[in-house]
From Swiss-Prot:
GO terms for molecular function: copper ion binding. Signal peptide: none annotated. NCBIfam families: chaper_CopP, copper ion binding protein. Keywords: Copper, Metal-binding. Part of a cation-transporting system which is associated with copper export out of the H.pylori cells. Cu cation binds at C12, C15. This is COP-associated protein. Residues 1-66 form the HMA domain. One of its GO terms (biological process) is copper ion transport. It comes from Helicobacter felis (strain ATCC 49179 / CCUG 28539 / NCTC 12436 / CS1). It holds the Pfam family HMA.
């Protein structure tokens, strides 16, 4: 499954690295693409990962969904 999540507050490579770290820790995530210009994160995943878990990881990293 592939989802595109709007994320507020990402401004630099450190933000990209932090999102990739938190989301990448979820089992089942196979791809993470962070687009600073569009303020979005694209994630490809399969079970046991879920859209809800990915959104929670982004929130845990300190960013807002939007």
């Amino acid at each position: 499954m592939k989802i595109d999540i709007p994320v507020k507050g990402m401004t630099c490579q450190h933000c990209v690295d932090k999102i990739e770290k938190f989301v990448g820790e979820l089992e089942g995530v196979s791809y993470i693409g962070v687009d600073l210009d569009k303020q979005s994160v694209q994630v490809e995943f399969s079970a046991p990962a879920s859209a809800e878990a990915i959104e929670e990881a982004i929130l845990d990293a300190g960013y807002e969904l939007g």
